[in-house]
Design a protein with these regions (language model features):
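Glycine-rich phosphate- or other oxyanion-binding loops that anchor nucleotides, phosphorylated ligands
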Residues: 2-6, 32-276
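Gly/serine-rich nucleotide phosphate-binding loop at the start of the catalytic core
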Residues: 7-16
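Short Gly/aromatic-enriched secondary-structure transition segments
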Residues: 24-28
Length: 276
């Protein structure tokens, strides 16, 4: 271990997602191991380690396990931006899901006389998107038991903290070109999904909402949730909406609002840390 101080791990894919957290960090110390950068310090009254994991499921999972191996971690948090799926959510809002699934761990079905069919013997349980049939992943938990699992739960105490915070926290509307008409809100509970894809497609977004009732989607959180669950560590992901995936000028919205979304997520993340 790099140090023996009990810490909360806070992961973000990009520097912009961790910017507000790094600004608020005190007693900061940098640690580099084989190219991996970890920043320890105090944040919202808690000892933490900030980790920029990089975009993608593999990067996120690798960074999460690496952090658990190198530090004495009590809780795992992901903070940053995401694409909106639920049409009721707006850019700048923060979504704290109750569970995360890996919607692009899939079977590519064969086309038959009546349409695409999944492989025999591989359970799906969810409707398909063309040839794509989502399936559970095989996981081994901290008790050593192996099972098929689609949803990875968020720690109840961390959800409770988020719900209490949602009543009082005031999120930013931004400023200048990145200013919103209405003050964003925090939504707690429900589903969210992650996969190795930047989604700029309305049909896929609609499918994800109808099939999984997901509030948001991203490229990292479910992978970190998977690692946290296997290690028996409490987990939460806090995601600010930078765009509505595939809607209108979604890619332009992302460019304009990803920092605001990340900063709003950071505000909620720090509130949750204070409550732990």
């Amino acid at each position: 271990m790099l140090d023996d101080t009990p810490r909360i791990a806070v992961l973000g894919a990009m520097a912009s997602e961790l910017a507000a957290l790094r600004k608020a960090l005190t007693d900061a110390a940098e640690h580099t191991v084989a190219g991996g950068a970890f920043t320890t310090g105090m944040l919202a009254g808690k000892a933490v380690v900030l980790v920029r994991c990089g975009v993608s499921m593999v990067n996120a999972a690798m960074a999460a396990q690496w952090t658990l191996d190198l530090f004495d971690i009590s809780h795992v948090v992901v903070s940053g931006c995401a694409g909106g799926v639920d049409p009721e959510l707006k850019v700048g809002d923060v979504f704290v899901a109750g569970q995360w699934g890996q919607y692009l761990d899939v079977v590519m079905g064969r086309e038959g006389p009546s349409g695409f069919e999944p492989a025999s013997g591989i359970p799906s349980g969810y409707g398909n998107f063309g040839m794509i049939f989502p399936k559970p992943v095989m996981v081994t938990g901290p008790d050593g038991e192996t099972e098929r699992r689609f949803w990875f739960p968020v720690a109840p105490a961390m959800l409770t903290a988020a719900r209490k915070l949602a009543v009082t926290v005031v999120l930013s509307k931004g400023s200048g070109a990145a200013q919103l008409d209405k003050t964003p809100k925090v939504t707690v509970g429900g589903n969210a999904v992650s996969g190795a894809a930047f989604v700029n497609n309305t049909e896929l977004r609609d499918y994800v909402f109808e099939t999984f009732q997901a509030g948001v989607l991203d490229c990292e959180s479910a992978a970190v949730a998977h690692v946290a669950w296997c290690n028996g560590k409490p987990f939460v992901a806090v995601r600010g909406l930078s765009s509505l995936a595939g809607a209108g000028d979604g890619d332009k919205l992302y460019a304009a609002f990803n920092q605001l979304a990340s900063d709003n997520a950071a505000l909620v993340t720090m509130g949750i840390l204070r409550a732990l």
